[in-house]
């Protein structure tokens, strides 16, 4: 919960999409011991974010029933009836649903289960230190070429501009139009990639399975 002596930060999880490339609601896909969206939600709940706005859309009732919401955190679930109009409609609803106390919103994608509490906290602290309108991570990437990603923090003073975005335009449009607004924070490793296709999902399942096996001290199949 919010501490009296620190700025209030909101987190907005965009999880309303129709998953057209996947062909089924990816929010509900099992990944380890939880559904895919629960991984993102759990990381946000564990972070220093003071509230979480979870934006649902397609099959909102089924998704809401599949996730666990802890009682001790301020979590607001909102349903975007216009999710077919693209991600911008969910971003707009999320910003408008955030607390009036909030000085910024950290934007997370509901199909990035590799996001971590540590990364969210690092970006939150970087935002507060930078004083910029936008702060985003810049991942090193396996190829050595820097790759921008999420979570992206947007200062309240540019929310009105973000609410004018249309279709599937995300904050990247604002960053392209106003590079002077942006501070990029170098982060080691690969970005927490989206789960857009069956192949993406299968790779995520394999990764989680391998982590579970290693954590238990067992030997992975095929390794001796």
Question: Where would I find each of the regions flagged by the language model?
Answer:
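Conserved alpha/beta core of the MobA/IspD/sugar-nucleotide pyrophosphorylase nucleotidyltransferase superfamily
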Residues: 2-8, 160-224
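Nucleotide and nucleotide-moiety/phosphate-recognizing core
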Residues: 3-148, 161, 180-188, 209
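Short glycine- and hydrophobic/aromatic-rich loop-to-beta-strand nucleating segment
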Residues: 150-154, 193-195
């Amino acid at each position: 919960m919010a501490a009296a002596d620190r700025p209030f930060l909101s987190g907005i999880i965009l999880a309303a999409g129709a998953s057209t490339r996947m062909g089924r609601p990816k929010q509900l896909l099992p990944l380890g011991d939880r559904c895919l969206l629960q991984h993102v939600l759990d990381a946000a709940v564990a972070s220093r974010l003071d509230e979480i706005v979870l934006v649902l859309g397609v099959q909102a009732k089924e998704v809401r029933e599949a996730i666990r919401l802890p009682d001790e955190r301020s979590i607001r679930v909102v349903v975007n009836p216009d999710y077919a109009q693209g991600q911008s409609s969910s971003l707009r609803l999320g910003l408008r649903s955030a607390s009036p106390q909030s000085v910024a919103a950290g934007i997370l994608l509901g199909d990035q289960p590799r996001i971590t509490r540590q990364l969210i906290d690092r970006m939150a602290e970087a935002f507060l230190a930078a004083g910029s309108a936008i702060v985003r991570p810049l991942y090193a990437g396996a190829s050595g070429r820097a790759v921008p990603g999420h979570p992206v923090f947007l200062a309240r003073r540019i929310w009105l501009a973000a609410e004018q975005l249309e279709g599937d335009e995300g904050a990247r449009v604002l960053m392209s139009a106003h590079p002077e607004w942006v501070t990029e924070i170098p982060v080691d490793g690969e970005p927490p990639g989206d789960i857009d296709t069956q192949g993406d999902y299968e790779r995520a399942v394999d990764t989680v399975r391998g982590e579970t096996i290693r954590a238990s001290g067992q030997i992975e199949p095929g390794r001796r």
